[in-house]
Amino acid sequence: MEGIHMLRDLLKRDDYLIKIDLKDAYLTVPICKAHQKFLRFLWKGTLLEFACLPFGLPREKLRKIRKKCQTLLSGTEISVRELSKFLGLLTSSIQAIFPAPLHYKHLQRLKNTTMSSTQSYEAIVTLDTTAREEVVWWRDHLQAWNGKALFQQPVDLVIETDASRKGWGAYCEGVSTGGPWCSEEKRLHINCLELLAGSFAIKTFTKDKVCAHVRLMMDNAAAVAYVNKMGGTHSQTLANLAIALWEWCLENQLTVSAQHLPGILNTRADRESRIITDSSDWKLNPSLFQAVLRIWGPLEIDLFASRLTYQLPQFVSWKPDPLAIQTDAFSMNWGKIRGYAFPPFALIGRCLRQALSQKVVQLVLIAPVWPTQPWYPLALQMCTDLPLLFPMSTDLLEKDHQSHPLTNLQLAGWRLSADVSKQLTFQRKLENCCWQHGEEIPPVLMPQPGISGLAGVLNGKSIPFQYL
């Protein structure tokens, strides 16, 4: 059948097109005398018929769809026959409305389900919330999306993606990344995980891309099909994931296509999806974190986190992450932010040096109470408030509902600053330490296990903990 698909195959780069305004030229195309009676219309009481070729205005088609949408929204039920007609009206617009397939698949599934169970076109379909939302989209967005590019934009970015039962992986332009699934994601079918991996990969590697066409290389045929067709009707979960991916891409002015990559060649992304070895990615119990916010908030950026452990809407990851605003906290300037840092313990000293070198005004640090560590005296010196001592418990730290293996870990929260005036203001409020060198520390009335009640002594001043 001749149409826009044939034209796309005939044209090539640097061809010239001539546009003819048929507003007048179409009047030169005659209609067979015997067929003119089929082109009659009534105007001001007079019956007229076309002797030449008539052309309808595109806006009339738009009005027809919007009018039908309004009719559907005025009620809650429709027959399968009428729904089929409406779907035919929508599917006929695919060549002109780019995101059309995203917004009728639920209606299509509703029709198929009803037809399968009743075997009758006269059966009544009740429009649920999702169905009505699709109709509303057509009513409200039809004009804005009217007009679709004839040719697909050239590919700007190629991303290889893969999924395993452990996690997801991706590779793009020499950079590899990946991460584990959360407990809810692990229960999904592998096809869904493959599509989710593609979604994570796009969000990870397109943070600085606008108006770009992204090509996903995937070794799962179902995921490829659902991306290219903007959804499907066989799997509701897969369809929802595909719609969510496309809506995010359109919101960020991106287009996406998928291509099958044989599994034997998809080695780089596959490797990332199976090597899940980050044992330092944990977060403070959310209830304790909220207590920290109430005392020292608001805080702006979580400097050491991942999509499974972040505590603030904006966070920085140590490797490319779909939700992180940036990678590598040490490459940032902390001087003008109210940062929250729960770094791997081996990086605590580096964090303190970064805060000093960048003259950080305030940093909330979560760190263990390890007085013998080289960084500990510096942490005491930078304090601007009494450190918060967290109770030891099995749920002190968590990640995806898992407990940290170190059940006797003693953590504290520290409000730090590189501003010497703030440090001195805090130190003036402290009491003098009355202990002499060599004296035994007196027992506290309400001792914390393994803790004297003091964070330490600085310049002859005692720095006690405050307890949560």
Spell out what each predicted region is:
Residues E300-L468:
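Class I S-adenosyl-L-methionine-dependent methyltransferase catalytic core
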Residues D9-K12, E49, P58-L150, G263:
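C-terminal reverse transcriptase regions that engage the nucleic-acid substrate
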